Curated annotation (Swiss-Prot):
Keyword Nucleotidyltransferase: no
InterPro entries assigned: PCI_dom, SAC3/GANP/THP3, SAC3/GANP/THP3_conserved
Protein name: SAC3 domain-containing protein 1
Major localisation: cytoplasm
Native organism taxonomy: Eukaryota, Metazoa, Chordata, Craniata, Vertebrata
Native organism: Mus musculus (Mouse)
Subcellular location(s) of the protein: Cytoplasm, Cytoskeleton, Microtubule organizing center, Centrosome; Cytoplasm, Cytoskeleton, Spindle
Length: 427
């Protein structure tokens, strides 16, 4: 078998669009955005006219049918919530009586025949509004400060629980955050306060969903439902941005998260490109646009360089697309390098190029696609490459998990991570 010598590594990088200046994948070229910066609470100049309501339909966003600003249409004023707790006392008592408490909500040591609700752990569950049913009284609605404290609790105390599977945590958190959005929509809340709550809720949801491994979703969590909840969170937040005049300090970051979560979507890109130019020029949105451009152009070398530089929350948003991008990159290498006798590349090149977590993950990826291994090299033989099923799940430590860098999820969610060191900038 022919050996793919060291001097030919540059050929592999050229094949993947990583060397020649201005070289893309042969598709239509898009302008490159290279400006990067912090994605925390940075105020970017914004126009009084914010983004339009998304033209594509958000899946199942039923709780927003009676949104915060229906008073402008009906002439009535919505009340403000008065409930001081994360869960109204009446609901706590009812669910305790009906034995419908989640194990994350019971008092320590109270998991026996009659578990007791812990007021400091019980969080209001989502209940779909029924047609013709009167609005809940203010005593059952949590005001914005309580809603924000609830989100902080979910991010700081629940999301990182090690005694419960990530799938169960994600299912619990997604339901409780859905109730947060519903409580918010039933009150006359100022847009700035609403945006603060919705941003924190969406950041928490993105993080807990990203931690769920595919093998954990059987029974404990429905991945489609979790994705729907994330899209509903984006829909609620972007409508809030569209209604208000701002400025919203984190809008650029969350518009960028929207694009990264929907990477490759024409509709999502159109929505972002319709934002005011001043907002699009903010570093977080420039970074997201650069990632989207590299993904569309199949410029895999640039894509994985950019992915390495993204902060933690942005990495959580894009994680779902990483496996697909790795598969496309490996397929392109196979098409370019496969010969009847076979050319080889070092596994450590594949590991670094695709930002994999170690040589074993590189072996697993190559073997899952039918490629032959020769010690620590992968052999590209014509006709061997195959794609069956989904790409193998990765651990994503390099591209996602390691980017908290000693900070907590609560820091990230509450925009208290401004001093987090960035992994670096891409060329």
């Amino acid at each position: 078998m022919g050996r793919f010598k060291g001097e030919n590594r540059s050929q592999a990088r050229w094949i993947m669009g990583g060397v020649s200046k201005g070289r893309g994948s042969g598709k239509s070229r898009k302008p490159r955005q290279a400006a990067f910066g912090q994605t925390g609470a940075r105020v970017c100049p914004s126009s009084p006219q914010q983004d339009a309501v998304p033209r594509f339909r958000w899946p199942g966003d039923a709780e927003c049918a009676s949104s915060t600003h229906t008073p402008t249409m009906s002439g009535c004023k919505l009340p403000m919530g008065l409930c001081p707790d994360m869960c109204p006392a009446a609901e706590r008592a009812r669910r305790e009586r009906e034995r419908r408490l989640h194990r994350l909500e019971v008092e320590p040591g109270g998991r026996g025949n009659a578990p007791r609700a812990d007021p400091k752990r019980t969080v209001k569950e989502y209940s779909r509004p029924a047609a013709g049913k009167p609005r809940p009284p203010p005593s059952l609605l949590r005001p914005p400060p309580v809603l924000l404290a609830t989100v902080r609790y979910l991010a700081g105390e629940v999301a990182g629980r090690g005694d419960v599977s990530c799938a169960e945590v994600a299912s619990f958190v997604a339901d409780r955050l859905r109730a947060v959005r519903l409580d918010l929509s039933l009150q006359g809340v100022d847009d700035a306060d609403a945006a603060t709550v919705l941003e924190a809720a969406l950041a928490t949801l993105l993080a807990v969903v990203a931690r769920v491994r595919p093998e954990e979703t059987r029974g404990a969590a429905d991945p489609v439902l979790l994705q729907t909840q994330v899209q509903e969170g984006f829909g609620s937040l972007r409508r809030c941005y569209a209604r208000g005049k701002g400025p919203y300090p984190r809008q650029a970051a969350f518009q960028g998260l929207f694009l990264l979560y929907n990477l490759g979507s024409v509709e999502a890109l159109q929505e972002v490109l319709q934002l005011p130019a001043a907002l699009r020029a903010c570093p977080p949105l420039q970074a997201a646009l650069a990632v989207d451009a590299a993904f569309r152009e199949d410029n895999h070398a640039r894509l994985f360089r950019l992915l390495r530089t993204l902060p933690y929350l942005q990495s959580c948003a894009v994680q779902e697309h990483i496996g697909y991008a790795r598969r496309k990159a490996l397929a392109r290498l196979s098409r370019a390098l496969s010969t009847p006798k076979g050319q080889t590349l070092p596994l450590d090149f594949i590991e670094h190029f695709l930002a994999l977590d170690g040589l074993q993950e590189a072996r697993d990826l190559c073997q899952a696609h039918g490629l032959t291994l020769d010690k620590d090299r992968v052999v590209f033989l014509r006709g061997q490459y195959s794609e069956e099923g989904l790409p193998p799940p990765g651990a994503y430590h390099i591209l996602v998990g390691n980017k908290l860098q000693g900070h907590t999820l609560e820091d990230v969610v509450m925009a208290e991570e401004g001093d987090i060191h960035r992994p670096g900038s891409a060329a």
